[in-house]
Amino acid sequence: GCMLEAGALANSQRYAASLPPLGTGIILAVLTAVVLFGGAKRIGWTASVLVPVSAGLYLLAGGIVVFSFYDQIPEVLGKIVGGAFGLADNAGQTAGSSILNFSGISGGMTGYGMAAAIRSGVSRGVFSNEAGLGSLAVLHGMSEGKGRLRQRQEAQKQGMWAIFEVFFDTIIGCSLTAFLLLCVFPHNLTEKIDSLGGSGAVAAALAARFGNAGGIVTAACMVLFAFATILAWFYIGDQALGWLMRDVPQKRADKICILYHGGYLASVFLGCVSRMEAVWAVSDIFNGLMAVPNLAALVLLGRKVRRPER
């Protein structure tokens, strides 16, 4: 998680501020270390400040750009729906195959396109909203109520917030990004992403409406979003490591924690300077490994989750 966030941040800074990834990696690793060694309270406070500011700023700027292209919204919506079912890229080929009566080939191409779209959409969606991974439970567990009844009420409240976060992140945030890019770059979006990267393309889209200020807005949002997420992933890993070492002698546990801290900071730096394709591939594998045991646990604990509501 932290490597992808660091890579996206470095990409946006390279476009907006002409800052090389090496420099971004050093600065980001140092800032991360300053917050991490302040403990869980500093991590929670920093994230609680950064996330609302960055989300509000991005929604405002992106919404202005999208509504300035209001006449293109129906066409963009059609592209999104077609792409979701793998129809957009293969439309011309499918039509040609139908004329030649190659219905089997046409169906196979369409099926492959749908499968590829679903695989890509699920993997990117899971990385974005972390639905089904079990990671958000660790973060929401930081909120505690006094007394048994208050603890139960707080747990239910945090569960509802977790559901809302998935909706907000995917339906609102990701949809806004899709409309933003497709409205501004209706014909050359692939080339823009290949040359600038994902966050660089978003910066270019905002710059098309706001000029240099658009790039600054994107850079600021990416810094706030990515930094808050990097801190959150550290806390998740730290809590998991603490549980695994609950029976380990304290001195040995302290040494392992130091190694974890150093390895995490190194991962933040490497994320800024690594090829994103390789990082995405590794992240997809580990997300799958996280989802399997968590989804199995959700099925087994389903009755206990429903029981307090009866």
Feature-to-residue mapping (PLM):
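Helix-loop junctions at the membrane interface of multi-pass solute transporters
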Residues: 35, 117, 124-130, 134-155, ...
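Select transmembrane alpha-helical segments in multipass membrane proteins
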Residues: 26-27, 92-128, 172, 209-224, ...
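Hydrophobic transmembrane alpha-helices that form the core helical bundles
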Residues: 1-17, 197-202, 223-245, 262-272, ...
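Membrane-interface alpha-helices at helix entry/exit sites of multi-pass transporters
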Residues: 25, 145-168, 248-259
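Membrane-interface loop-to-helix entry segments
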Residues: 8-13, 19-28, 32-81, 241-242, ...
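Extracellular/periplasmic helix-exit of transmembrane alpha-helices
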Residues: 61-81, 85-102, 108-109, 141-153, ...
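Transmembrane-helix boundary/entry motifs in multi-pass membrane transporters
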Residues: 15-18, 163, 202-218, 243-256
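Hydrophobic alpha-helical transmembrane segments of multi-pass membrane proteins
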Residues: 1, 27-34, 50, 60, ...
